[in-house]
């Protein structure tokens, strides 16, 4: 499916700015559309609400950081745009089904298994 230019621009803006506090209003202003119009268009083309897409993108980025970096969980929370690490942990747990510490420990377990099998 091919997204409209407005939705492509909104998605690009999210990908470029997910690490800070952004809103539908801000993105709508950036692409010269009303928030109501962007909200409807985004949902109709992507199947997701703007806020759900933003949250999903942030939490998937966080998962990648938990797996691929040694950053502390609170650092990752800030790096993906959350201002409160405890809220980040709650949202991560709700979205991923496990807490960020579990994702991190699974990575550590996998890397040890690889090391021990050599």
Predicted features and spans:
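Terminal helix-turn-helix DNA-binding modules in bacterial transcription factors
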Residues: 11-12, 44-83, 105-118
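Hydrophobic, helix-rich cores of sensory/ligand-binding and other regulatory modules
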Residues: 1-3
